[in-house]
């Protein structure tokens, strides 16, 4: 019996790893356009509306003005995304609450971001989902899922900017056009991955679909035990980053 299990288990695992790219490639799509539609809070899913309302008050206390709440449409397969977008024009910092309506229930995270004249940007968020396709090398993303308070996350974001973009001044956006920055970031994802041959634009030009290269990478990185190992490594890296930031802050206080 034990010998049978030892033989069957690798066979099943191998079959799953062999079939997963086919399933992912046939199902996964990324929208080519980010069609942002303003939406009132009372038209949102009850849980998403409550989360946006709570965060709007918290961000206002931090000096961030609400740009608006938007329906982003189906940016990826089997999801519908919504965003509450904020801007602090005094510091040229941006913030957002992103929520996704999914078959297994809504999920959300908060984020602060800064962009610079050299084309780089730094994002600090609470998103626990790791990307399965290569990230933009010009966008440094720090994911601290253990942080829930916007004030704490903003403090960490500013420490991260000071560490990784010293001397660079954040760039703002003209008033009443701030949300276009969000649209540019989202719409830049597909073409960038297509240039790296992980995705390709479908015949209708409305969405990007995975190439075999992208499907294999996405499927295998999303399967256990790879996903477990990736999360453990990332969690350790972010804990180390927080300790490093704390050490830098303490050293700065001692010099003051």
Named regions from a protein language model:
Residues 1-10:
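Feature marks short, highly hydrophobic, charge-poor N-terminal signal-anchor/signal peptide-like helices
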Residues 9-17:
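Hydrophobic core of alpha-helical transmembrane segments in multi-pass integral membrane proteins
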Residues 19-82:
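N-terminal topogenic membrane-targeting module
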Residues 37-46, 50, 54-57, 137-138, ...:
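Polar/charged alpha-helical tracts
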Residues 60-205:
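Structured extramembrane domains adjacent to transmembrane segments
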Residues 164-256:
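A eukaryote-biased signal for long
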